[in-house]
Amino acid sequence: NGDVRISYAVSDTTSPYYRNAIGDECVYVESGSAVVETVFGALPVRQGDFVMLPRTTIHRWVPQDVDGSGPLRTYAIEANSHIAPPKRYLSRFGQLLEHSPYCERDLHGPTKPLLAEGSDVEVLTKHRGNGPSGIVGSTVVHTTHPFDVVGWDGCLYPYTFNVSDFEPITGRVHQPPPAHQVFEGNNFVICAFVPRKVDYHPLAIPVPYYHSNVDSDEVMFYVD
């Protein structure tokens, strides 16, 4: 739709250099492992990671077949906006509050600068244009390598969050879907229905009659 795009990719080869100039991306790693090389540095990723890539971040995926893990399998969510923790998890200063199902220590940023060298480096760039969907692509050639960076400053950077670090919110009776929310974008949310103790009151209804999502579409992605 006009707010979010979803895709699924399987690969065992290094991707081209890429930049999404339209919105943030959240990529879930179903299986496999990789290093996401970015202008901010190297970002190791593994099974169960949500990989958060801010808009316009130049990057490429380098799959790593560790211990026969096989090809990299990913589920990608592309926004037309930023993707961030829900506002109710945050203080007015941007800190994750105690009732949030995860904390800052669960978020992992790039490990070190890449200091890559090269010239005439092609970067595939997705941006707005006059195509049927309003989205087009261009190839931008950088005269010097975009990863030839010794450091950076600020608080906007790619990071990973592993779903195993998500602490589920439970209750004696059925909890509504927002209890399972991990991130949000403009007009959509990302939830994780992780293993948990559910509806443990003796008279609880596991799937109550009033649980009907009539105002939004749902896409369920099942993983082991």
Predicted feature residues:
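Jelly-roll (double-stranded beta-helix
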Residues: 1-224
